[in-house]
A protein has these predicted regions:
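Short, well-ordered beta-strand elements
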Residues: 61-72, 91-96, 117, 168
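A structural signal for short loop-to-beta-strand junctions that line the ligand-binding cleft
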Residues: 107, 116, 146-185, 324, ...
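Extracytoplasmic/periplasmic substrate-recognition and gating elements
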Residues: 86-87, 92-94, 110, 189, ...
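Extracytoplasmic/periplasmic solute-binding protein
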Residues: 164-172, 177, 202-254, 268, ...
Length: 453
């Protein structure tokens, strides 16, 4: 994940994607398919199924053009595109960077003029797949291709790229959160960072020690727990570590459980003890903590991988594993982007050929090696490429090992609306001192209505 994901979040996709689903429901009532593909009604087929759709344009010998729209810039993919086109002179990739990406995709979907290739950030695969805008990938065929090495993808990718048990996008890039600390400050206080990360009790004790040396260190607080642009990002790790699950076995929301309450109570205890300031929204939620960390105002902080290059080298800092529950349960947030093929693509085999190259070891190596913005390597075998721009002294490889415990809530087609409800209810707890349990109960009632759709 990088700043590009943030850019899409800032577009506020909630109402936009909700319109896609609402239109789908309205059309279904009229016995019309999910999206209004007025210009070209193409059935959703399984990519890699062997359907010879390329013959429609391929017989003439004309070059196939695949239109690709993305929230990213062209230079991010330029080397991969050029390498693919050199190996495949019969296929041309027409790349277009779109600023208001979600709005444009909606407009094109309702007009039946979707691009062939669609970037899918966290939660978007499920929304577009449910709306009928994406084609399925034949995963059995991908796994059978030994050169592609499908099983090299991190296991976590399945949650982000599938809908209703089928793969509608393939993993491309992303980013997770981790923690960094000021080595000099910790050394002055005699604090040793456990290899596996602080337990909650150890984290509290470290905060206490840092506060006892506050004046000597020149800090305002040991750390800050920022209410990020998404409330889910802030609390997901703590809730998961406490033993909470977003979904129960019956598909209802479980974020009003005793474990969820315990997570809120623990974070609130850090505030009550004066170890962190009151939970608030600082700036856009991404750069604010790094700015304070660089200035020596806090001794440790949570950092998104895609913003970690803003950590200054004149500060003696290192990465550390995320805090973990006293029983060892550990969690962090992972965002993962995929790329899919639109349901209106007339050349899905050519599109799949490009996507397979882009997400192959060769393609991802070209993509990651010179990328100035850190991205996770979606393939386990390429993990070191994601943090190759950092000096080894910063221990940034911990962001790779952190993928073993990083994840996110279960993603469904109503994710955007769920995100809004969660944010509103968490705000009531943090900013209006609302009762934790009753607020979570009310939140779950609303979420269950969405989950039942």
């Amino acid at each position: 994940m990088n700043g590009n994901i943030k850019k899409i979040n800032n577009v506020k996709p909630v109402n936009i994607w909700r319109k896609v689903i609402i239109r789908r429901e309205n059309k279904m009532k009229k016995k019309v398919i999910a999206l209004v593909l007025t210009a070209c009604m193409v059935p959703v087929v399984s990519v890699g199924s062997g359907v010879d759709v390329m013959a429609a344009k391929g017989d003439s010998g004309d070059k196939i053009t695949l239109n690709w729209q993305s929230y990213d810039s062209y230079d991010k993919y330029q080397k991969v595109i050029e390498a693919f086109e050199k190996e495949n002179p019969d296929i041309e990739i027409n790349f277009e960077e779109v600023s208001d990406y979600a709005t444009k995709i909606l407009t094109e979907a309702t007009a039946g003029d979707l691009p062939d290739l669609i970037n899918c950030n966290t939660g978007t695969t499920q929304i577009l797949a449910n709306a009928g805008a994406l084609q399925k990938f034949d995963v059995d065929a991908l796994k059978a291709d030994t050169e592609y090495k499908f099983d090299d993808f991190w296991d976590a990718a399945e949650r982000y790229c599938t809908y209703d048990g089928d793969w509608y996008s393939l993993p491309l890039d992303g980013g997770n959160y981790g923690w960094v600390y000021n080595v000099d400050m910790f050394d002055k206080c005699g604090i040793e960072v456990p290899e596996d990360g602080f337990t909650w009790d150890e984290f509290t004790e470290a905060c206490k020690t840092l506060m006892e040396h506050k004046d000597e260190l020149g800090i305002e607080y040991p750390t800050i727990i920022n209410d990020m642009s998404s409330a889910i990002d802030t609390m997901y790790p703590w809730i998961t570590e406490a033993g909470g699950s977003y979904l129960n076995d019956d598909g209802t929301c479980g974020w009003n459980s005793d474990e969820t309450v315990t997570a809120f109570e623990y974070v609130k205890s850090l505030v009550d003890e004066g170890y962190v300031p009151a939970i608030e929204k600082l700036g856009d939620g991404y750069y604010a903590l790094i700015t304070k960390f660089n200035a020596g105002q806090i001794a440790m902080c949570r950092v998104a991988l895609w913003n970690s290059t803003y950590l200054q080298d004149d500060v003696n800092w290192k990465a550390m594993n995320a805090p973990r529950a006293n029983d060892g349960t550990q969690a962090e947030v992972l965002f993962l982007n995929g790329i899919g093929i639109s349901s209106s693509c007339e050349n899905p085999e050519a599109a799949e050929k490009f996507i397979k190259y882009l997400t192959s070891e060769e393609g991802l190596a070209l993509y990651l090696e010179d990328n100035t913005s850190p991205q996770i390597a979606v393939r386990q075998s390429q993990a070191d490429l994601s943090v190759s721009m950092f000096d080894e002294s910063h221990d940034m490889k911990l962001f790779n090992t952190g993928l073993e415990y990083a994840g996110y809530i279960d993603l469904t087609e109503t994710f955007a609306d769920q995100q809004t409800i969660i944010g509103q209810c968490f705000d009531e707890i943090w900013h209006n001192d609302a009762d934790i349990k009753s607020t979570l109960d009310g939140m779950v009632d609303q979420l269950n209505s969405l989950l039942a759709q």
